Amino acid sequence: MNKKDSSFYLIKGYPGLTNMAKYIMPYIPTSKVYVEPFAGLGRTVELRHDKIILNDMSDYAINYLKNEYGEYSETCEFPVIITQEDFKECILRWDSEETFFLIDPPWRKNIYKNNEKPFSNKTPIQYYDMLLNHILPNVKGNWILCVDRDEHEIGKRVSKSIYNNLVIQHPTVKLFGKSVAVRLCSNKEFKIE
């Protein structure tokens, strides 16, 4: 059985979605093109799509992705493409009705190695506002936007958006005394694929 048929998961990288990946994956539809505009270290990639695009502005993340996924590009029946461009350019370039975007922008400013600025001087809230109000309404493909807990400002803003919302909590893992949770926001209804 090849990795594509077995829906092989690759879970690694920053703590963001690492613990939640297996709970998020059932909501991700199989698509011809799978894109992560903020890939980080590629912690939630599921190898069941025809083409996978992992994008990040961080030099550290890009070098890691090239080392980690180079072997899969050669051994899988489908390409893993690694790009280093602004997330808006990445979304525009790969957008089609056959594309699925897993969009996981930084939740906080202080998570980057050596204070590396991965995008610009914008705050994470400004990125979410830009995505929800200007970019995602025009996307042809399907998408899921991942957000930190609801008690933070970003989670509150996303929960009030016009899009479908779903909160997933990890059943056992706790962080700062609370269950690890992520809010998902999408342009389509949430259903397990």
What annotation goes with each model-predicted range?
Residues 1-193:
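Class I S-adenosyl-L-methionine-dependent methyltransferase catalytic core
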